[in-house]
Every structure is written in C-alpha cells, then in structure tokens.
Amino acid sequence: MRHGKKINHLSRQTGHRKAMLANMACSLIEHKRINTTVAKAKALKQFVEPLITKSKEDTTHNRRIVFAYLRSKYAVTDLFRDVAAKVGDRPGGYTRIIKVGNRLGDNADMAMIELVDFNELYNGGKKEVKKAKSRRGGKAKKAEGTAPEAPAAESESTTEASE
C-alpha cells in the first residue's frame, strides 16, 4: 500500500525521473523560464525550490548538497551567484507556474514555469509608448510657426554679443 506517498512518478523509473528533473532544473536556472507539461512543472517546483533556499547561504556544504541534485557545476555556480542574490530577501515561492494551453500533438496541458524575480528579462524591453495622434495638416502649421522664431532669437543674441 502506498499510504502517504505523495510523489508524482511521472510514469518513469527513479533514475530517469531524477535525471529529468535535474536537467529541467539546470535549464530553468540557465534560462530563467521554460515550457513543459503541467505535471512536470509541478514536480520541478517541488524539486528546485529547496535548492534555491539552500543557495541563499553560500557555504561549501550547501554547494555540495545542491551539486548532488543538479550534477552541473555551471548551474550550481549560476544558482549561487545570480539567483541567490536576487531571491535573498524572499522567504519562499521562487517559481511561478502559468498554464499556456494544450499541446497540438497529444493535447497535453502545457505550462510555463519561471523564476519570479527574473521577470524583467522578458518584460523589460516591451514598454509601450503611446504616440500622439495628429492630423495630416498639423505638422505643416507647427513647422511654419516655429521657423520665424528661431532666427529672431539668434539675431537678438548676436546683437547682445556685439555690444
């Protein structure tokens, strides 16, 4: 009987599941956002959040524990250097799962999992600037009105300089 065992096996054996979650966690740390199925995203959230909590305290012991799970020294370095600096004051909830619809091939529920504090990497460059709407004849009138003022200002400054 499997009373009280809440792990989602994801239809995989233990070694395959651990390797898949380690690879997905490395990709999440590297890219800060990945697309996957909802079930894998929920399993990845349970896998990676304790590792991010350990990365907040940079000790050799914590680095070795995290490396035992991730198996990638580049991901461990990135986690302890960049991610831990951003989430230092956050008490938990480092990831966000957003459902994005169904996959075309097999209609599986898809989700995007991302690190919460790294949202500006994707949304920072998309600031919308409203353009002022003008009529066709508006520019010609403004150009005619500003043209005589500029030489008059220059002539006043030249007379002041000559005196």
From Swiss-Prot:
Gene3D superfamilies: Ribosomal protein L17 (3.90.1030.10)
A single GO BP: translation
Cysteines joined through disulfide linkages: none
Bias type Basic residues, positions: 128-140
InterPro entries: Ribosomal_bL17, Ribosomal_bL17_CS, Ribosomal_bL17_sf
Compositional bias annotation for Low complexity: 145-163
GO molecular function terms noted in the UniProt entry: structural constituent of ribosome
Pfam family, one: Ribosomal_L17
Keyword line: Ribonucleoprotein, Ribosomal protein
Location of region: Disordered: 127-163
GO cellular component, as recorded: cytosolic large ribosomal subunit
Protein family per UniProt: Belongs to the bacterial ribosomal protein bL17 family.
Record text on subunit structure and interactions: Part of the 50S ribosomal subunit. Contacts protein L32.
PANTHER family: LARGE RIBOSOMAL SUBUNIT PROTEIN BL17M, RIBOSOMAL PROTEIN L17
Name the record gives this protein: Large ribosomal subunit protein bL17
Taxonomic source organism: Flavobacterium johnsoniae (strain ATCC 17061 / DSM 2064 / JCM 8514 / BCRC 14874 / CCUG 350202 / NBRC 14942 / NCIMB 11054 / UW101) (Cytophaga johnsonae)
